[in-house]
Amino acid sequence: MARTATIKRDTNETKIQIALSLDGGFLAVEESIFKKRKIDDDDEHAKQATSSQVINVQSGIGFLDHMLHALAKHAGWSLIVECIGDLHIDDHHTAEDVGITLGIAFKQALGQVKGVKRFGSGFAPLDEALSRAVVDLSNRPFAVVELGLKREKIGDLSCEMIPHVLESFAQGAHITMHVDCLRGFNDHHRAESAFKALAVAIREAISSNGTNDVPSTKGVLF
């Protein structure tokens, strides 16, 4: 069964469409929310298509696009993110709502937590930075994120929003996750290594455990 989902979420602050395939492969949306908007070259920086993955992230915030591109690439996903947000106010609503909606898409695409490992962990270095992530597909939304970022912003994304995006994803996905940057002095590297570590952990957690069982002593995870 294909583990895919397409979610549309409209509020007074953001209009979002996300399509996700947890196992990669071809992915498309029926109709883009950008149909009346001219696409320029700046929108192509987080776009990649191969025989195994389709990734196109257009949140309106360049560094957020970069992080979600890295997450999708190393998790093995195909991912399309479209967002029109109230960036004339600030980046908060856009970043938060994209995280929430991606989490909802993840939960829907995964379906019943059955026949998968449930737990996953990963480390990812980026030059001097090293991050660790541990994930539990628990249906218990909780996130501990410690990245130690010191800059006010990276590109147009506030550094305070970077852990909040991850927390919002965990809430929407109903998963427990711990993400820590263990060392590093470049905030770009610290953040990117964290998203890559999370990708490695998620990829393990959603992989087959060789059974058709629910991986819980409760017998259910919903």
UniProtKB/Swiss-Prot annotation:
It is an enzyme of class 4 (lyase). One of its GO terms (biological process) is L-histidine biosynthetic process. Pathway: Amino-acid biosynthesis; L-histidine biosynthesis; L-histidine from 5-phospho-alpha-D-ribose 1-diphosphate: step 6/9. Gene3D superfamilies: Imidazole glycerol phosphate dehydratase, domain 1. The keyword Nucleus does not apply. Its EC number is 4.2.1.19. Keywords: Amino-acid biosynthesis, Histidine biosynthesis, Lyase. Pfam families: IGPD. GO terms for molecular function: imidazoleglycerol-phosphate dehydratase activity. Belongs to the imidazoleglycerol-phosphate dehydratase family. This is Imidazoleglycerol-phosphate dehydratase. It comes from Scheffersomyces stipitis (strain ATCC 58785 / CBS 6054 / NBRC 10063 / NRRL Y-11545). The gene is HIS3.
